Amino acid sequence: SLPFGFPKVLVSSAAALPGLSTRFLRASDIFLFNSVIEIAGLTGLLRNVLDRAALVMTGMLHGPVTEPLTDRTKAIAMTMVSPCERCARAVRVQLEKEGYEVVGFHATGIGDRAMEAMISLGFFRGVIDLAPGGVGEHLYGFMRDAGPNRLESAGRMGIPQVISTCGVNHITPRKSKYTREHDLRRRYDLDRLRTWLRMSPRELKEVAALF
């Protein structure tokens, strides 16, 4: 619940557990410190870990840290993913020529949530939403799930929002949960680890209804 830019450090021996950091960090800009050893008994090793974590916090409190945004009236939020990088770059260049500061969010679900939260806090004057695929991902519970309030914050804040469609027609179920039907779909491989599957006509209609 602490705002973006407020110094935050979390020391945990479970920081590296799969899925745990995602569950607790969500859209927070918290510094996660993996202690490696259990936090029990002040041994020399644990003191070393805690000392370094304390120095991290000291640096954030007293170091020459740049303010999050120098002028919120010039800040524009923009979502993007790999397939629309060229478009995002062109949009950024044009807006910067007009004197705006463009803040990008990787639309992987967590990035979308972070953007919506920061819009609600008044960080931005406008939104360029190139990659709102998290809407459909939330509907079906897949990996880019951006939560139930995706696309809503800008309207509530009364700021302009331009919405495009990159990634809206694809889904990202975990490969370990692929069904036979998933294996038969057209696919788009972003890299060795990430694969998008084409939505069915029924799914496209269901997602379109949400927009």
List each model region and its residues.
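Short glycine/serine/threonine-rich phosphate/pyrophosphate-binding segments
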Residues: 1, 17-21, 84-89, 112-113, ...
